[in-house]
Amino acid sequence: MSKTLTIALSKGRILGETLPLLEKANIVPVEDISKSRKLIFDTNHEHIKLVILRATDVPTYVDHGVADFGVAGKDVLMEASTKNLYELLDLKIAKCRLMTAGVVGQPLPNRRLKVASKFIKTAKAYFAEQGIQADVIKLYGAMELAPIMGLADLIVDIVDTGNTLKANGLEARELIAPISTRLVVNKAAYKTKYSEIEPILEMIRRAVEDNEGK
């Protein structure tokens, strides 16, 4: 009998792009996730279950071995403190950029910078690598307000079209990292459940290649 495999999926935009990809890989929930309040779903494979989580929780569930696989954005993985997972595959969906941004045309001050972001770990590492002294302020939303209101000189945030920045008088500055959705696996599970994991990984890999070949 095959060992049960649990795949942790991120809520939101990523979920909307992940489900069609999984369907191409012949992994389909037995009920409509969008119409259910459930968080755990059976699939057309008796040994595969899907769990719907907040994006930032996906690496934690995989790291602790509660989920075998996880689907999460690279931005979330960069910010997570994990030791027990492998990043196996770039799913090449939900693409965007992690960037610095500031008020249009406003030069940076000649002092220690103030930076607002929800990506504290990544922002600190980036400015340290650049040799720039910066205090990073943790925010949870509406990043665009921080430079406008004088809370910060720059923000570090996800940029898709850039329209939200432009609408608030901001401009994207420096690219920190291109972001896309990744498939991760628990290290122990990859060894103990290899015979179950590898076929699924191959199906998903082919689905990604099929998407790219369009």
Curated annotation (Swiss-Prot):
A GO biological process of this protein is: L-histidine biosynthetic process
Where would you find this protein in the cell?
A: Cytoplasm
Its UniProt entry gives the catalysed reaction(s) as:
1-(5-phospho-beta-D-ribosyl)-ATP + diphosphate = 5-phospho-alpha-D-ribose 1-diphosphate + ATP
Class of enzymatic activity (EC top level): transferase
**GO cellular component annotations, sorted alphabetically?**
cytoplasm
Record's keyword terms, sorted: Amino-acid biosynthesis, ATP-binding, Cytoplasm, Glycosyltransferase, Histidine biosynthesis, Nucleotide-binding, Transferase
Q: In which pathway does it act?
A: Amino-acid biosynthesis; L-histidine biosynthesis; L-histidine from 5-phospho-alpha-D-ribose 1-diphosphate: step 1/9
Q: Which InterPro entries match?
A: ATP_PRibTrfase_cat (IPR013820), ATP_PRibTrfase_CS (IPR018198), ATP_PRibTrfase_HisG (IPR001348), ATP_PRibTrfase_HisG_short (IPR024893)
The principal location of this protein is cytoplasm
Q: Which GO terms describe its molecular function?
A: ATP binding; ATP phosphoribosyltransferase activity
Q: Which CDD domains does its entry note?
A: PBP2_HisGs
Q: What superkingdom heads the lineage?
A: Bacteria
Q: Which PROSITE patterns match?
A: ATP_P_PHORIBOSYLTR
One matching Pfam family: HisG
Query: Is Glycosyltransferase tagged as a keyword?
Result: yes
Cite the EC number. 2.4.2.17
Q: Does the keyword Cytoplasm apply?
A: yes
Q: What's written under domain?
A: Lacks the C-terminal regulatory region which is replaced by HisZ.
Family, similarity comment: Belongs to the ATP phosphoribosyltransferase family. Short subfamily.
Its assembly, as annotated, is:
Heteromultimer composed of HisG and HisZ subunits.
Q: What does this protein do?
A: Catalyzes the condensation of ATP and 5-phosphoribose 1-diphosphate to form N'-(5'-phosphoribosyl)-ATP (PR-ATP). Has a crucial role in the pathway because the rate of histidine biosynthesis seems to be controlled primarily by regulation of HisG enzymatic activity.
Q: What is this protein called?
A: ATP phosphoribosyltransferase
Q: What organism does the record attribute this protein to?
A: Marinomonas sp. (strain MWYL1)
